[in-house]
């Protein structure tokens, strides 16, 4: 419903921010990461928005980047993960760190986050990796076909599809994947994706 809000930051705390947009104050629930990106009160700010509708309330969640909002929505697809826990994950790790944990099948990286136990971490890894494959542009067919074709090309396509599904633009994903494979063509799909996430984040 809402893409983003641009206005004047009137107040901020580690878990929420109030933005004045044309005389109307909007309260956003935010992650610790977004809180650290906020300007001082009184300055202009842009927050990417997600609206959560409950029986008794409409809650706005605000994010400092589109990639953080995309990951928040992806986390909500996990069984047992609601907005509060998804926000906790984003407060505990940066976006690229969560991506890396998912693609590297490393649930132990999520254990230290408040509210995330071993079972929840394992579900996040399992369910999001599966959804990434299913949501890829080719429906996961390239990844599913383990035989035939050029292995290097298959690895490149698999990594590219995974990055696009995670919300990165195709040009950015192609640039990162191509550069990484040129330097080390023997990497696995997971290693390429992990390196690409770091490359895109630092670019």
Swiss-Prot record:
CDD domains per record: UBA_RuvA_C
* GO BP terms: DNA recombination; DNA repair
Q: Where is this region: Domain I?
A: 1-64
Can you say where in the cell this protein is located? Cytoplasm
Protein name listed in UniProt = Holliday junction branch migration complex subunit RuvA
Region annotation Domain II: where it falls in the sequence: 65-143
Q: Which gene encodes it?
A: ruvA
- Say what the protein does: The RuvA-RuvB-RuvC complex processes Holliday junction (HJ) DNA during genetic recombination and DNA repair, while the RuvA-RuvB complex plays an important role in the rescue of blocked DNA replication forks via replication fork reversal (RFR). RuvA specifically binds to HJ cruciform DNA, conferring on it an open structure. The RuvB hexamer acts as an ATP-dependent pump, pulling dsDNA into and through the RuvAB complex. HJ branch migration allows RuvC to scan DNA until it finds its consensus sequence, where it cleaves and resolves the cruciform DNA.
From which source organism is this entry? Answer: Chlorobium limicola (strain DSM 245 / NBRC 103803 / 6330)
Ranges for the region named Domain III are: 151-203
Q: Which residues cross the membrane?
A: none
InterPro entries referenced in this protein's UniProt entry, alphabetically: DNA_helicase_Holl-junc_RuvA_I (IPR013849), Hlx-hairpin-Hlx_DNA-bd_motif (IPR003583), NA-bd_OB-fold (IPR012340), RuvA (IPR000085), RuvA_2-like (IPR010994), RuvA_C (IPR011114), RuvA_C_sf (IPR036267)
Q: Which GO terms describe its molecular function?
A: ATP binding; four-way junction DNA binding; four-way junction helicase activity
**Quick one: a GO cellular component term?**
Holliday junction helicase complex
């Amino acid at each position: 419903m809402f893409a983003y809000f641009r206005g004047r930051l009137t107040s901020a705390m580690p878990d929420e921010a109030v933005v004045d947009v044309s005389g109307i104050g909007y309260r956003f629930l935010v992650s610790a990461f977004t809180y650290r990106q906020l300007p001082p009160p009184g300055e202009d700010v842009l927050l990417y928005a997600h609206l959560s509708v409950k029986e008794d309330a409409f809650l706005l969640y605000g994010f400092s980047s589109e990639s953080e909002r995309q990951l928040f929505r992806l986390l909500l697809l996990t069984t047992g993960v609601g907005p509060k826990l998804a926000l906790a994950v984003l407060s505990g790790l940066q976006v690229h760190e969560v991506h890396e944990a998912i693609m590297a099948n490393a649930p132990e990286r999520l254990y230290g986050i408040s509210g995330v136990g071993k079972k929840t971490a394992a579900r996040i890894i399992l369910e999001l990796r599966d959804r990434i494959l299913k949501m890829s542009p080719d429906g996961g067919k390239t990844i599913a076909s383990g035989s035939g074709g050029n292995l290097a090309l298959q690895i490149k396509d698999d990594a590219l599809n995974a990055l696009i599904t995670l919300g990165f633009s195709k040009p950015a994903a192609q640039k990162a994947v191509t550069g990484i494979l040129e330097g080390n063509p023997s990497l696995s799909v997971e290693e390429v994706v992990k390196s690409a996430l770091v490359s895109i984040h630092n670019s």
